[in-house]
């Protein structure tokens, strides 16, 4: 018997956790799923389930590393955990680009860390529209005034990066206390335990504060490929979030970017081990492709309706260059500068050929804090189009964020 069908009964929201690695993001996700499971809305996920990818792959077309699903009374959530290792920022950029909102996890015992600042900044750059804060480790803070102080610090930090710091819900709690309470009594319901209730309060805030986005279902289908793997006897699977449009089994799609463009047919679509007849904008899906080998396709390519997007190397863009205080460069850069461009799920080196100031004059040098028009050339072709956002990085730091304004070639 194949996987069950996915029931589209509630609005689907993509959410994620961001924050300092040691502030307990992953066990925090386990706390949410375990809590909501007792509301009859979700299945509990153990910590090992959330951080483990290879075992999941044996079960069908599954989604990258740590996509977990859960439901509240009003919504269906896909939750992406940005992994906390060397690839963190790369995954944060691709993961955050898929988020309709994020839960920022901050330790109430430690307050905001240097990474917290970078993660809020990245969330702003890649366009995470809404943030709710979970102040973890409340059980380690005896002093209410200290808790208020940390809350104030977090609000100020969010306001610094143009999030509405005064309005954002901040929910204190302890993911460890919640998990321990549920482990010792798996039947705990809302109202039975103060620590578990704090997780409910957080998800109530997420339900209320993060709006249901309008999905681009009218536009032509596009999905950036986040991961690729093979299933013996079934073929090759590409996973990612559908950026726009609708896709059905047996539709033809093009694989665009990096190498030559290829056409293939979709033979299956799944979300969380459940089959879909069609995938909609906003869905995190695995798409099974006919006649495609693992060598033909890689992260950074896109699947698209045939003839709707083409690979390019040269484009004009409008870019904001971060200041030193925002975590950017301390010094100017010049034409010929070759940073890394993060476009949807791709990271590719490019050289900057020309800078143009707002008045149309050509400039040789760009300072941190400048807003500038620039022409860039990537070392290999990537599926890009006007209006696409990107982030520019070098040496482990974000130095700018921009939008493609014109395709040159």
Swiss-Prot record:
Gene Ontology cellular component list: chloroplast; cytosol
Residues reported in the UniProt entry to bind Mg(2+): 26
UniProt domain tr-type G: residue ranges: 10-214
GO molecular function terms attached to this record: GTP binding; GTPase activity; translation elongation factor activity
Catalysed reaction, written as an equation: GTP + H2O = GDP + phosphate + H(+)
Region ranges (G3): 81-84
InterPro entries on file: EF-Tu_GTPase, EFTu-like_2, EFTU_2, G_TR_CS, P-loop_NTPase, Small_GTP-bd, T_Tr_GTP-bd_dom, Transl_B-barrel_sf
G2, as annotated region: 60-64
Region annotated G5, chain positions: 174-176
Enzyme Commission number(s) from the entry: 3.6.5.3
G1: annotated span: 19-26
CDD domains: EFTU_II (cd03697), EFTU_III (cd03707)
Chain intervals for the UniProt region annotation (G4): 136-139
Keywords: Chloroplast, Elongation factor, GTP-binding, Hydrolase, Magnesium, Metal-binding, Nucleotide-binding, Plastid, Protein biosynthesis
Binding site for GTP: 19-26, 81-85, 136-139
Localization per Swiss-Prot or TrEMBL: Plastid, Chloroplast
Family according to the record: Belongs to the TRAFAC class translation factor GTPase superfamily. Classic translation factor GTPase family. EF-Tu/EF-1A subfamily.
PANTHER family for this protein: ELONGATION FACTOR TU, MITOCHONDRIAL, ELONGATION FACTOR TU-RELATED
Function text: GTP hydrolase that promotes the GTP-dependent binding of aminoacyl-tRNA to the A-site of ribosomes during protein biosynthesis.
Protein name, per record: Elongation factor Tu, chloroplastic
Source lineage: Eukaryota, Sar, Stramenopiles, Ochrophyta, Bacillariophyta
